[in-house]
Amino acid sequence: MKKKLLLIFIIASFSVFSEQIVNLPESNIKSDYIEINKMKNTKNVIVLEKKDIQEKGYKDLSAILDDIPSINVGKSGWGDIDIRGQGEGSSAKNLQVLVDGAPITTLVNHPLQTNYNIVPVENIERIEVIPGGGSIIYGSGTAGGVINITTNLKRLSKLINSAEISIGTKGEKYSLAFGHKLTDKITLQLSYLRDNKDLYFKDTYRNSDYFTAGLNYKINDNQNLSLRYSKLFEKGQFVRTINYQKFMKEKKNYVPEDRKVTVGLDKDGHKIEEIISGYANADRKFESINLSYNLNPTKNTKYLVDAFYNKGNFSNTNLGNQVMYHHTYGFKNKFDIEYAKSTSFEGSSLLLGFDLYKQDAKLEYNDYKTLNYKKKTYVINPLSFKYNKKTMAFYLLNTLRYANFESSQGIRRDYTYWGFDKKAAKNKGNEVSHRHNTNYELSLGYNYSDTGKIYARYERGFTSPDGLEITDDFSKYDIKATRGEDEIYDLYEIGWREYLGFSTVNLTAFYSKTDNEMSRNYILDPDLGFGRKTINILKTKRKGIELSLSQKLGKLELKESYAYLKGKREYNGREGEFVNPGSYIDWSNSGLQKVPKHSLTLEATYQFTPRFSSSIRYSYSGKYSNFSNIKDKEEEGFISSYSITDLSLNYHHENGITIYGGINNLFDKLYFEYVGSRMYTVVPADGRTFYMGIKYKF
């Protein structure tokens, strides 16, 4: 089926060759961020504009990203975003997520996980995805890539006044935005959104309130100051995973059994127990404040500083009152210098940067230690897991232009101080691990015509341990920082961009390798029993192709995107120091675990009239292996491919009213966002859903 659809798109493109109207390629779209503008000429940057994501039935950021072929959301773990086939166990830490340039990447993903659905779809102006790399600007965790979400608060010079209501089979939304010019130099933007989501299973939901406020002060023609505030408050309950057999029997009517939890001890030391719902708690809070200052001291220089502060908490568990609190604050400085004016190197520039920020997270709850087994008496054993990570970095990115050539050379020095204060059930410890790394980048691009470009780039980056790996060195009484090294990756990328008469083409091929990948291996401690220890005994290679095409053929617009991802993991020669030969893994050659080899998205939009249009989108996700060890192949097997078709309609009236609607998963396909080991547990995706809405801009 997928081959036929792709063939239809290609034939249609050639058959109307004479009706060519070519779209701007993504590389020519100016970013709101100076660093991305410098990177995108010799790097594949995927850009999704507001018009690409709004009024199309996307329920959240995860749904938007999952339609990008090189990204998989939820396959490698609940809430995980996997870019360029990192696979299970690696995707969460090989990722950087930013909102308006400020980092919100989760510091620790154990034992509680979360997702990145912080900003509602209605408040997103643009999403920029940098697949693989970006380490000169963003530092650790960019092996998979970077996602930068630009909200309506970033563009305070463009005021928004609107009201919107949307309803559907999965809930309803109400939003209001108000912008006003207070003076010739000061503008104010406010917005509020209420989102009531009905989830897959009976009595499951996520209801949220999202408020934003922004103030922009244009000091003069060369200076600008903006202050932005946002707050998300979310409540709900949901089912994290469900047994596959139970799901096939009960489907959407499944209700998890109530759970008995201990909430304290009485005066005699006996447990006080309560019965709570078996649903996972979806409560979450997220609050952020951002301050940006831009200064143009001269015609050839720019200074930009972004200060940020955010805090919040989440649970996403059915284990009781366990809550993870997190907090990030700091600033990013950028100083850009254009040089070589009126010379052969005109257009060259040097970007200098200094980053300083700190992230912390904590989880605290009570455990109950047996005092007398026969009398069933206990004592409270408070557990505490506190993490903090301080990052200080200096970098420079030089962009050199000469005739039709463009080259970038970058270097970044990172100083990371990874600390923890941890009290577990049987041991404790606190320590700070000092980790220093240097990243490099070198690229060369050549504009061989007015419409065509080829480029090649090399990048060296690193990934530091996550919150769980950093404490993977313990004894009977102590917890110490891991002796595992930071992972080092080498990325090679070549690209081609062109207008082929009737179509834009953006083709990228990449190869990356990590020779010291971290692995959490089981160890047996005589007192603590089985545990894990982080050691660098693996090497992993990943390769892939990313292709995107677009055509404008009269009233018909076509878009095609495809990704091929393949990885291979094996031992690097150090396994003998740590692992018993009898425990060696016979690594599979069928690709990394939970990474589809082929992914495809096709979209057609037809403009019936200047005001009325309709779109149909087809998404295909290929099969993938659910195992790493060849001996598990028969038991774990492969997870089947699936395809989804979405339909949307949109009508714009001249008085500012937009009416839209559509059907997602048109053919009501049953598929799973996540499949656990041996397909024992699954997370089902939504079936067919309907939606419609009306928006008024005033």
Predicted segment positions?
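Extracytoplasmic beta-strand/coil segments of soluble accessory domains associated
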Residues: 62-103
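Gram-negative outer-membrane beta-barrel transporters
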Residues: 401-405, 416, 510-514, 533-630, ...
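Short acidic/polar hinge/loop motifs at secondary-structure boundaries
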Residues: 103-131
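Conserved C-terminal beta-signal and adjacent last beta-strands/turns
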Residues: 179, 445, 456, 492-494, ...
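Flexible loop and strand-edge segments within Gram-negative outer membrane beta-barrel domains
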Residues: 197, 224-290, 312-326
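Transmembrane beta-barrel wall of Gram-negative outer-membrane proteins
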Residues: 166-196, 201-240, 281-298, 335-337, ...
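Outer-membrane beta-barrel signature, preferentially recognizing the C-terminal barrel domain
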Residues: 258-288, 292-293, 382-390, 433-435, ...
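Surface-exposed extracellular loop regions of Gram-negative outer-membrane beta-barrel proteins
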Residues: 358-374, 415-422, 445-493, 504-505, ...
